[in-house]
């Protein structure tokens, strides 16, 4: 089992959610986050003064998936989140040692 974490542009969330849902991913966790990478933020004009915005709004998506789905999930996220411009985001894949469904006590892949 793997935990796939993707940091994407907020306006791409619906497309990514639909792509994951259509391939059978049962659930995701979404968190609003801020960060920066190579784009290093940007300058905004507010009431005649320039301000540097260091952290850009992003969305973090987390999905626990069976090993057999990992490559397909990565491809789905890449395809749905890509704009071809800087700041499209990153995908991280972590090993999951254990998953427990609290309500039923199911463990492992059955708990996904």
Regions found by a protein language model. Give the residues of each.
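Positively charged, small/polar-rich N-terminal and surface patches that mediate targeting and assembly
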Residues: 1-112
């Amino acid at each position: 089992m793997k935990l796939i974490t993707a940091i994407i542009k907020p306006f791409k969330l619906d497309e990514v959610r639909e792509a994951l849902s259509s391939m059978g991913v049962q659930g995701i966790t979404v968190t609003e986050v801020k960060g920066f990478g190579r784009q290093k933020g940007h300058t905004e004009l507010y009431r005649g003064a320039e301000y540097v915005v260091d952290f850009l709004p992003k969305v973090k998506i987390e999905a626990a998936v069976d090993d057999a789905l990992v490559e397909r999930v990565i491809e789905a996220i890449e395809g749905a989140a890509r704009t071809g411009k800087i700041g499209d985001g990153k995908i991280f894949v972590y090993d999951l040692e254990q998953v427990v469904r609290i309500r039923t006590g199911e463990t492992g892949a059955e708990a996904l």
